[in-house]
Amino acid sequence: MKYFVVALTLAVAFVCIEECKTVEIGYAVSEDFDQNEIDNEEARQAFKTFTPDWNKIRNDAKRMQDNLEQMKKRFNLNLEEARQAFQTFKPDWNKIRYDAMKMQTSLGQMKKRFNL
């Protein structure tokens, strides 16, 4: 019972502390909001006077599009080569089974040797 009372007291104290932080944070946010309204007005004025360099933007977009086309061509070529290699791949299942059994035997011997 004593531990329950202590735990309950700590929980109430924690909730009170968190509520105080929330009130302080809310007040700080409202102060910042007033400052942000001024900053937003400055941003609006700066945006009105902003004139983008459309030629540079078009050139950058064209260059990115060309790079994308080159990547597509290169990827499709490699994808086709991979498809052909996969179709011609014929695994030797007997050798794979034999290797797996050999590894399993080696693993069993290692377990015995190291008492695993």
Curated annotation (Swiss-Prot):
Quote the tissue specificity entry.
Expressed by the venom gland.
Q: Which UniProt keywords apply?
A: Pyrrolidone carboxylic acid, Secreted, Signal, Toxin
The primary site where this protein sits is: secreted
Extent of motif Processing quadruplet motif 2? 80-83
Q: Does the keyword Transcription apply?
A: no
Q: Does this UniProt record's set of keywords contain Signal? A: yes
GO function term, MF aspect, one: toxin activity
Residue(s) carrying Pyrrolidone carboxylic acid = 84
> Signal sequence span per UniProt?
1-22
> Per its UniProt entry, which superkingdom is the organism in?
Eukaryota
Renumbered ranges of motif Processing quadruplet motif 1: 41-44
Give the free-text PTM comment from the record.
Answer: Cleavage of the propeptide depends on the processing quadruplet motif (XXXR, with at least one of X being E).
Q: Which GO terms describe its cellular component?
A: extracellular region
Q: List where in the cell it is found.
A: Secreted
Task: Spell out the residue numbers of the propeptide.
Answer: 23-44, 80-83
The record's domain comment reads: The mature peptides (45-79 and 84-116) probably form alpha-helices which disrupt target cell membranes.
Similarity annotation? Belongs to the cationic peptide 03 (latarcin) family. 06 subfamily.
Q: What is this protein called?
A: M-zodatoxin-Lt6a/b
- What is the originating organism of this protein? Lachesana tarabaevi (Spider)
Q: Give the organism's phylogenetic lineage.
A: Eukaryota, Metazoa, Ecdysozoa, Arthropoda, Chelicerata
